[in-house]
Design a protein with these regions (language model features):
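Long, contiguous internal "core" modules enriched in hydrophobic/ aromatic residues
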Residues: 1-173
Length: 173
């Protein structure tokens, strides 16, 4: 499923950590609820509601095995960077193409865009200046366009500022 160099143990550990964190947070929430001076049935309702706040929390509360939640649920818990790393680590081009096809994109294009968006997200998350900046990584541009794409981005050399990234985001949304 993954390339040899792909650190799938890292992905599994990330998912385990998210589940463990969700379980610990739920336990802490339950302990706090026990200190409230409200009827027991209200406490139980609040605990039930809190157990369903996200799937990692729900899975840890509801199931003992298998250890890890289903893949579809794990995808919901991964960050953009983790999803980008996962996509780039897929071994078979057919798998990448299948995912990219759902977005009407070529697989190398999607991989490039995910990486670029991850870099931009990290710039924003660390409160760095984004405007009028060259992000350091240029996203690949489509060779042939089968979707709405700005005509001024048809030339390969004119895509080193934020307009390209905003166009990518617009297309993916």
């Amino acid at each position: 499923l993954f390339k040899r160099r792909y650190q799938h143990d890292r992905l599994l550990q990330t998912i385990r950590n998210k589940q463990d964190k969700a379980r610990d947070e739920y336990q802490r929430d339950c302990e706090q609820l026990e200190t409230l001076l409200i009827p027991e049935e209200c406490k139980e309702r609040l605990k039930a509601t809190r157990s369903r706040e996200n799937y990692a929390r729900y899975y840890g509360h509801k199931y003992n095995e298998p250890d890890l939640m289903p893949g579809w649920a794990a995808m919901e818990e991964l960050t953009l960077g983790e999803l980008s790393f996962l996509y780039s680590g897929l071994n078979r081009d057919a798998d990448k193409k299948s995912i990219a096809k759902r977005l009407n994109l070529a697989a190398p294009l999607l991989e490039s865009w995910l990486h670029c968006l991850t870099v931009i997200r990290n710039i924003c998350a660390h409160h760095a200046r984004l405007w009028n900046r060259e992000p350091g990584i240029k996203p690949k541009l489509p060779k042939t366009v089968s979707f709405p794409w700005p005509s001024n981005l048809q030339q390969q050399e004119q895509h080193h500022r934020m307009f390209t990234v905003l166009s990518i985001l617009n297309l993916l949304m």
